[in-house]
């Protein structure tokens, strides 16, 4: 893995996104956006959840333009501007396809070496769980110098909902998320199990389970942490051409 990155460093860079204004989001996967040119385009919305607190018609948004014969839509909705907990507006990453890639880059940059130790290998979407019917987001192999040689199972959760300066997950009932917690507990004690909330906005100081949205998830979350599942909230900020590392955040169990 590469050298350590400091808060504010760019972990991912990309071609500058195109800014516009959100007109509406509909059919879960679609969003109409008016570009600065006055043109209205339809963008793919990878986030099919309720997007609580970050879906605001009339807000500024950023889109990625990537035409392809394999894609029905050339535009993808990547970021949204929202009122932040600090009273300032901030940009939120809303593309649920990004967090796994982002957390992988975070590990590769050495940002989590203090928590995870040195890592020799990263594999994605490895089968595990009951009858190996699930896939873990990232499976890490410790380097030889890592004092804990157990494999590390990382489950990543994109997190955009907030209550003040606390990030919350989930923002709706998620039976899939409940199952992931149970399966993380299942790899203990022969492996390390780490839940990584990907805090896709820079204005948060802590993470907590979204008890009001999914009480059962909150119960399982506390059971998991009591059983030895580690929780490692990772915070990021977003610009028009990069995602920046902002460090880890505290876990608040209330």
Curated annotation (Swiss-Prot):
Signal peptide: none annotated. One of its GO terms (molecular function) is DNA binding. InterPro entries: SfsA, SfsA_C, SfsA_N. Gene3D superfamilies: 2.40.50.580, 3.40.1350.60. It comes from the Bacteria. Belongs to the SfsA family. This is Sugar fermentation stimulation protein homolog. It comes from Synechococcus sp. (strain CC9605).
